[in-house]
Amino acid sequence: TLLASSAASDVYKRQLLENGDVVSSQDFTSKNQQEVKDGELLTGLLGEKEKFAPGKKYKEELSVQNSGNIDTFVRVILTKSWQDKEGKKNTTLSPDLIELNFLTANGWVVADQQTTDERTVLYYTKAVKAGDTTPALSDTLRIDPKIATEVEKTVKDKTITYTYKYNGYTFHIDAEVDAVQTHNAKDAIKSAWGVDVNVSDDETTMSLQ
């Protein structure tokens, strides 16, 4: 999923990339015209006839491309969940077992105060020029192997049954990508995201307060 917050005119175009491929995109113009193309993450996680293995690391490189005509700062909100066959979230199952390895030595930072077990908020601290793509904010995904130890015991008519808690559930990751202009970025970010930041005089870098 790719959503947007825009705080200025001109043309905002950003794309969410997964392992180099466009998953979602959104175009926004000063005339309040929007074109949104939503996609789904993790659909290409497994190879043909490959079975998923808890504990194994799978390639999951997420990045953002600025395909608009103005420079922007971007943030990404990732939400992890377990869902049943009908797509209903089960909030009693732990999103912590869905592990993305975040890369924070390349300009991305995790906003700890805005992050929960279910939701991770990341900011790219450098301006993304028109036409450029950020470095990957993550590189791998794995499911904690202790998922196999999560069992429920039931007793009926002297018969004991053990059932894996996560049977019948699939894991999901939703990504929301937001962008604001670099011009007057401090005020634009506060207005659009409600976040206080420091912005360099040349408006090429920012940091959380």
Which role fits each region the language model picked out?
Residues 1-8, 12:
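Single conserved hydrophobic/aromatic residue that forms the stacking wall/gate
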Residues 4, 18-19, 54, 182:
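Generic structural "secondary-structure junction" signal
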Residues 5-6, 35-42, 63:
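Extracellular and organelle-lumenal recognition/adhesion modules and their flexible linkers in secreted
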Residues 10-35, 83-121:
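A surface/secretory-pathway sequence property marking extracellular, secreted
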Residues 42-51:
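N-terminal post-signal-peptidase region of extra-cytosolic proteins
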Residues 50-82, 128-209:
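C-terminal, structured domain-capping segment
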Residues 109-139:
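Extended, solvent-exposed segments with strong compositional bias
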